[in-house]
Amino acid sequence: MIWIFFVIALFLVTGLTLYAIRLLKQLKVQKELIAKAKNNRVIRLKESIDIIARAMQSGECNLSEGVMRLTMLLRPFGKNLSSYPAMANLYEVVRDMPTHDDRKLLEKRERMRLDLARESAEAQFEKNIKQELYILLEDIKSIELI
């Protein structure tokens, strides 16, 4: 009688061990997939930052739009524009300006007033922003997600 309990216990322990091994393998695969997804996200974010910064340097992207986009792209890295004073100053000027549909709802005079404020801020900070973009392009090579 004791042998029957021993055999049943042995089968149970063996079954549970095999199940635990299977779960550990699944966990390992899941961790690898998460690491790969995180790495792909880092690559995609860095590429986006690189494209926008280069477009700002070449004039394909206006500076105010660029700093708005860069601010959002730097957040997942735990970074902001404070390391780049001219870009941070321009961001402070344009961050509350309406965009897209909200901008369309403004009267023409108000739009022109905001455009003038934005363009004068861009002109004021342009030289320094162009210099800071080179620094940013170097900095993004070494940053990682938080």
UniProtKB/Swiss-Prot annotation:
The keyword Transmembrane helix applies. It is a single-pass membrane protein. InterPro entries: DUF2489. It is found in: Membrane. It comes from the Bacteria. One of its GO terms (cellular component) is membrane. This is Uncharacterized protein HI_0725. The lineage of its organism: Bacteria, Pseudomonadati, Pseudomonadota, Gammaproteobacteria, Pasteurellales.
